[in-house]
């Protein structure tokens, strides 16, 4: 790409709203931005007194700029977010946590509805409550629902195949509708009260339980009255420690804390007048140090992205003013088709909520900084242990997991001075011929990993750690030498020491040196942490691969079962165990399975 002349470009740049894309020498997109006036915004990048280190580094790599004129600043904002999500430019602030919020789901289409954890696309025939700030908040609420209202949480296949009550009934967390211990009418009443409770109408539920209890006592149904009394007491206990009341409506409170290039953003969630909790985000700031710029980028990606969160707050309280607040508010109103208010100058309760969110952000930052300092100290201890003249900033560790050679998986986990870099983790499905040979599997995985890193000019580790003894370490060192990386990558094996006791692991180096640092050594603690994570990641990958293969291989052996029928069977029953317990008539209920195929399936599983 030819040299870029900013002066010539700016002479012909439109003075209208739009989006700009900054390109490098290979045509890759470095940065995507929006502007009310494209010429004025782009001109600001090429001034002599630019203070931002990030901006100066960006400008030094620009070889071309492409622009798209839009009808308004709102359109520019929406297009900008679409391009950032698609292209993930290296100089844009990126929201790394793109996981959708969890909900509680009641399957209203079932004869005996179940109450479950849900994340993702909403399905017809179900009622949803939330969103909740975290999975733990959902599980806590579900535990409370089961304790008070005793509704089922089991899968449909498990429910259909019960012949006697399960443990949930024995510990008074389910009324056992699977075996007819509760009438459909009574169960429906419990589900309705559970839904009302989740909707925040706990007072109404308590009043209803009190009325039912008095009626049962008057009818001399003392066992039923005692059960209702216990339910009422549980709800009253919840009400005493109920979430803080905040008035009606849905709103989010957003606060930011920055320090040493790190940003922490807290989102305090208030739904139906109750503070449900908060969620912490750590956006990749890409060197940006302007708090308002980071906050604006976060808000745009968080609220304008395609997250599956149908509940949109009618008010968003901010800890500070952001430059594009008006355009963001208009974009939200356009996308959500309702009035939305962004506010930062507030009083009374709202000011207290902002203070609460800011306090959470400060606490999260303090915790994060302490963890980073601890990790950095461990890296320094490792450098001292290895007598390294070069800093160690990145460690990659490999481990192999298989069951007697079946479906072997190699894991590669990555750590730097900030901790685990899970976005850089990789699995490698090992060639079946090498599956039972840990040495061959390890060699294959390491070779594939670093051949690709070389090809893509990616980041190499400073230390390659291998879970295993001297033999595994030597195989890893062999591959590093083959790829001519021995001058830049240190290789180390970590295995059980002579005593085979935890904390007395032996470290093996290519030079033949062996070390046993001892259980108090900080460097060993770091290596143990990395090794244990590699082991966990490999085991998780192996179990998933083995389970998938066993499910598919068993069904694939049955005549007449192709991909569509296999998927329908697994969706309906959940697994092979449930299929083995199913009757021919139950197989016939599966979409796409006729009576003849149902009998074939039954005969196959009962050979």
Swiss-Prot record:
SMART domains the record matches: GIYc, HhH1
Sorted UniProt keywords: Cytoplasm, DNA damage, DNA excision, DNA repair, Excision nuclease, SOS response
GO CC terms: cytoplasm; excinuclease repair complex
Location in the cell: Cytoplasm
CDD domains tied to this protein: GIY-YIG_UvrC_Cho
Region (Disordered): 542-561
InterPro entries: GIY-YIG_endonuc, GIY-YIG_endonuc_sf, GIY-YIG_UvrC_Cho, Hlx-hairpin-Hlx_DNA-bd_motif, RuvA_2-like, UVR_dom, UVR_dom_sf, UvrABC_protein_C
Matching SUPFAM superfamilies: C-terminal UvrC-binding domain of UvrB (SSF46600), GIY-YIG endonuclease (SSF82771), RuvA domain 2-like (SSF47781)
GO MF term (any one): excinuclease ABC activity
Biased amino acid composition, Basic residues: 542-551
UVR domain residues: 203-238
Single biological process term from Gene Ontology: SOS response
Chief place where the protein resides: cytoplasm
Domain GIY-YIG: 15-93
Superkingdom of this protein's organism: Bacteria
Quaternary context: Interacts with UvrB in an incision complex.
Biological role: The UvrABC repair system catalyzes the recognition and processing of DNA lesions. UvrC both incises the 5' and 3' sides of the lesion. The N-terminal half is responsible for the 3' incision and the C-terminal half is responsible for the 5' incision.
Alphabetical list of PANTHER family matching this protein: UVRABC SYSTEM PROTEIN C, UVRC/OXIDOREDUCTASE
UniProt similarity note: Belongs to the UvrC family.
Protein name: UvrABC system protein C
Name of the gene encoding the protein in the UniProt record: uvrC
